[in-house]
């Protein structure tokens, strides 16, 4: 099974299955001298952890164990290996799935490709969103390293089912959405999302949603003009996330309905520099970052594992049958998916920042390490519940 790695200079390889002993990641290319602790990783993991309100009831603590690459809370320059053990596994929930592939899930394609006898049906195996724990671990390292360029990354849920954000949102509000149980950036929207989730849970159904992620102050000129355009790299990164169905940046698909005179973003003097009036391009022009905020959105489909009965094929007799999926599944995978999108954006930007020379390849100076730590502490403090930010 190839295709388990991402990145060129900052390269990650994820491993593990949903109901295996552990999931984990090997991160290659992190320069020596980066201040990094288990707490730094746990800070990001907490926002995708199951067992909380409105998400999967699977009670995982998601405690990261660092196996290599860090000594005295500093990276050594060697590969960083981190695992998270799977401690709340109930494989009996998947006994029926062994014979009845779930509609909307990867079950049947995996059987077709790898063979029924080789298919790990427990929790979806490698196709499970549990794999994204590894991405968030790596994303935490990438986010901290990006503090060297003062690039901050945060996301929120722009829509959930039929409900959507209808007003402008500040980056500070997006940061605060981390502590919203439904990743809403506005209090009234949070209440609407919560009502939808309760409804879906009662009906044994699920909802999809749109995640929006903003990267503030990315280095200028990241990406390449042809095949390695920043938009192409981000699209690949984000579309690799389970349940993601679509990707856009800036104006996105709305631009197809506009005139050139409307969609062209006027170039102006902006904060004593040359900039763009509205950032319609979402921070990317010609495949290169242009100094404006990088803004991307992606669509998550509704969680495919639902209690509502749906038609499938019983593989024991190849007759049509029905399946009602029991177990502990998210009523909206998009909620926890926001953190995963943030991580993939961070991994893409940090890899290109290293390619462009904006981040050292071998080691950080003491001044650089101190700057990173100070900015990281400020970032962590800035991520706080809406109520605290308004007080």
Swiss-Prot record:
PROSITE patterns: CHORISMATE_SYNTHASE_1, CHORISMATE_SYNTHASE_2, CHORISMATE_SYNTHASE_3. Reduced FMN (FMNH(2)). Pathway: Metabolic intermediate biosynthesis; chorismate biosynthesis; chorismate from D-erythrose 4-phosphate and phosphoenolpyruvate: step 7/7. It is an enzyme of class 4 (lyase). Its cofactor is FMNH2. One of its GO terms (cellular component) is cytosol. It comes from the Archaea. This is Chorismate synthase. It comes from Saccharolobus solfataricus (strain ATCC 35092 / DSM 1617 / JCM 11322 / P2) (Sulfolobus solfataricus). The lineage of its organism: Archaea, Thermoproteota, Thermoprotei, Sulfolobales, Sulfolobaceae.
């Amino acid at each position: 099974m190839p295709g388990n790695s991402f990145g060129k200079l900052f390269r990650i390889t994820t491993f593990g299955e949903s109901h295996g002993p552990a999931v984990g990641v090997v991160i290659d290319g992190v320069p020596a001298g980066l201040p990094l602790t288990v707490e730094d990783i746990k800070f990001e993991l907490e926002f995708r952890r199951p067992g909380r309100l409105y998400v999967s009831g699977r009670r995982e603590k998601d405690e990261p164990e660092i196996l290599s690459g860090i000594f005295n809370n500093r990276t050594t320059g060697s590969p960083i290996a981190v695992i998270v053990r799977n401690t709340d596994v109930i494989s009996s929930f998947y006994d029926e799935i062994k014979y009845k592939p779930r509609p909307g899930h990867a079950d049947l394609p995996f059987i077709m490709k790898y063979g029924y006898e080789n298919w790990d049906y427990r929790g979806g195996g490698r196709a499970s969103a549990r794999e994204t724990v590894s991405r968030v671990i790596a994303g935490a390292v990438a986010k901290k390293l990006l503090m060297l360029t003062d690039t901050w990354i945060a996301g929120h849920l722009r829509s959930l089912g039929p409900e959507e954000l209808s007003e402008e949102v500040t980056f500070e509000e997006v940061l605060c959405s981390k502590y919203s149980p439904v990743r809403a950036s506005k209090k009234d929207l949070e209440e609407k999302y919560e009502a939808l989730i309760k409804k879906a849970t009662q009906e044994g159904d699920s909802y999809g949603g749109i995640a929006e992620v903003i990267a503030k102050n990315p280095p200028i000129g990241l990406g390449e003009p042809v095949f390695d355009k920043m938009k192409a790299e981000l699209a690949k990164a984000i579309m690799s996330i389970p349940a993601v169905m679509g990707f856009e940046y800036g104006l996105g698909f709305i631009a197809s309905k506009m005139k050139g005179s409307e969609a062209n973003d006027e170039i102006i003097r902006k904060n004593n520099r040359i900039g763009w009036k509205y950032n319609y391009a979402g921070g990317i022009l010609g495949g290169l970052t242009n100094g404006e905020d990088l803004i991307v959105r992606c669509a998550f489909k509704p969680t495919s594992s639902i209690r509502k009965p749906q038609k499938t094929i019983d593989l024991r007799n190849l007759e049509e049958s029905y399946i009602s999926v029991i177990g502990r599944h998210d009523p909206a995978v998009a909620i926890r998916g926001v953190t995963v999108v943030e991580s993939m954006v961070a991994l893409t930007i940090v890899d290109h920042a290293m390619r462009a020379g904006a981040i050292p390849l071998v080691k950080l100076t003491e001044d650089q390490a101190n700057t990173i730590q100070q900015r990281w502490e400020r970032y962590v403090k800035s991520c706080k519940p809406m109520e605290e930010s308004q007080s």
